[in-house]
Amino acid sequence: MKTEYRLAEALKNMMSEVPLDSISVTTLTKKCKVNRQTFYYHFHDIYDLLTLIFLNEEIPELDEVQNVNDTLVYIYKYYLKNKGFIDATLNSAGKELAEEFIYNVCYKTFLR
């Protein structure tokens, strides 16, 4: 698995237990067993990694979503599946990233 994705998965898992603002690059890299320089080779900071997570979230079902109701159901199911991660993001300085992700999912549906 690529280092970026290992770091992303570790961050998502950690955010289910610890607030994002309490997670340091050092703690994250120790969990992934990579050094800090490796993290900074790929990312500027934790929020840069968080951006990658939201940009790369798999949403294959979205291509099949045809209306607003289906979009809302999709968002709800996504939230249930990723509750710890989403709640931690919404209660942190990364709140705007989660809001933008939800906005983009809705926007793509409304353009159809």
Predicted regions and their residues:
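HTH DNA-binding helix-turn interface
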Residues: 16-20, 33-50
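Basic, helix-initiating cap at the start of DNA-binding domains
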Residues: 1-18, 27
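Phosphate-binding site recognition
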Residues: 25, 36, 60, 80-83, ...
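Append "Primarily bacterial transcriptional regulators
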Residues: 7, 26-31, 39, 79
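A short secondary-structure junction motif
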Residues: 53-57, 82, 86, 105-112
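DNA major-groove recognition helix of helix-turn-helix
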Residues: 7, 11, 43, 50, ...
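Amphipathic alpha-helical linker/stalk segments
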Residues: 16, 23, 53-75, 86-87
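Amphipathic alpha-helical packing segments from all-alpha helical-bundle domains
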Residues: 70, 74-77, 95-112
